[in-house]
């Protein structure tokens, strides 16, 4: 507010079970329209023992200090720098501080509506999580989707397993499918898929929201039911569509006496590696070199998970993530920030935004 931004909270009904978001808007009308993305939440619960800030030289330890309190600070101080030289008031900028980045939940169309609208308004998108140092930038991030595979078999005495009347059972069918996924798709670049939980037997229960289940079975009874819950990541929507079609085809080729089905749910779309993103990284590299920080190379997308920049990237002309300071040990009690990188990422972001808005 002190810088002249219009700030407001976006909140949701209790039934959504997700935190709200803080937005700040500057509408000066000059140059490219910019949206900058941070997040306020961490993975650490209120009662988690890791709750202290400790500084050791240029290392600062604390919950969420790298992921991503420091990125939020870098965003704010880049705005302060632009205000200091009298440039901020003329710019079109939206700052989005998301409240539930670490666990999106089941209502992405609801809780990312405002962020997507900001992306449609903007020309350029920036994500302020770190990229692992001052010499790498993020021009792409993979998607995050989930899948649930269900197989069924004919329950009966195991002495007749593989017979024409009884067939192979649900567990053999799920094993066939998972192995076929591996054989046909595992070598494709930027495509990863992982079965994270499996429950199978005569009688099963599975809770997909909490990834927990129970199973009952006997060694002399052919299994009747299996549920497999997994994830899939891709570099583009085309790759995701192709992978889903391949997986569906594998699932449909059932062993005798079995049935199978698979369902997919996309949580985060991919941030695809467009030429415009590479060009924007080149502009940032020019600044990096001019400030004495060295070369800036694109980070391998397979090294990154999903992030909120992916909701903005399809709608803007160009996007970069990894704009924030360098830290390590995210999501652990060893999480720390390299304090020396905080002023560096702040200054180069301010200069890039200044140039984009001339």
Task: Set out the residue ranges of the language-model regions.
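Acidic/His- and Gly-rich active-site-bordering loop/insert found
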Residues: 1-63, 83-90, 286
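Residue-level recognition of beta-strand->loop/alpha-helix junctions
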Residues: 9-11, 97, 266
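Short glycine-enriched loops at secondary-structure junctions
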Residues: 39-43, 49, 142-145, 198-201
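Short pre-catalytic strand/loop immediately N-terminal to key active-site residues, enriched for Gly-Thr
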Residues: 56-67, 295-299, 332-333
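Acidic/histidine-rich catalytic neighborhood of metal-dependent amide-processing enzymes
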Residues: 68-144, 200-210, 357
């Amino acid at each position: 507010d002190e810088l002249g931004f219009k700030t407001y909270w976006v909140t949701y009904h209790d039934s959504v079970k997700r935190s709200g978001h803080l937005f700040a808007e500057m509408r000066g009308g000059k140059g490219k329209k910019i949206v900058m993305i941070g997040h306020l939440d961490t993975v650490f619960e209120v009662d988690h023992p890791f709750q202290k800030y400790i500084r050791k030289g240029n290392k600062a330890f604390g919950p969420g200090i790298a992921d991503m309190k420091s990125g939020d600070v870098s965003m704010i101080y880049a705005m302060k720098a632009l205000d200091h030289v009298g440039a901020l008031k003329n710019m079109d900028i939206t700052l989005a501080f998301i409240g539930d980045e670490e666990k999106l939940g089941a209502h992405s169309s609801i809780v990312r509506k405002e962020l997507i609208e900001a992306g449609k308004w903007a020309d350029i998108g920036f994500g302020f999580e770190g990229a692992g140092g001052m010499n790498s930038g993020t021009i792409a991030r993979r998607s995050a989707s989930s899948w649930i595979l269900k197989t069924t078999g004919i329950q009966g005495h195991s002495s007749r397993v593989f017979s024409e009347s009884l067939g192979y059972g649900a567990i053999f069918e799920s094993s066939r499918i998972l192995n076929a996924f591996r054989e046909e798709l595992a070598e494709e670049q930027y495509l990863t898929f992982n079965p994270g939980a499996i429950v199978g037997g005569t009688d099963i229960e599975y809770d997909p929201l909490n990834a927990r289940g129970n199973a009952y079975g006997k060694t002399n009874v052919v299994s009747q039911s299996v549920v497999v819950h997994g994830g899939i990541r891709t570099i583009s929507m085309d790759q995701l569509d192709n992978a889903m079609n391949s997986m569906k085809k594998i699932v449909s080729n059932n062993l005798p006496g079995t049935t199978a089905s698979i369902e997919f749910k996309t949580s985060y779309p991919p941030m695809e590696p467009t030429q415009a993103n590479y060009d924007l990284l080149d502009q940032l590299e020019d600044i990096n070199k001019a400030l004495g920080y060295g070369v800036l190379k694109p980070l391998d997308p397979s090294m990154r998970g999903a992030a909120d920049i992916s909701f903005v990237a399809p709608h803007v002309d160009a996007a970069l993530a990894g704009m924030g300071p360098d830290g390590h040990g995210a999501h652990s009690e060893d999480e720390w920030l390299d304090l020396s990188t905080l002023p560096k990422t702040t200054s180069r972001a301010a200069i890039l935004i200044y140039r984009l808005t001339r």
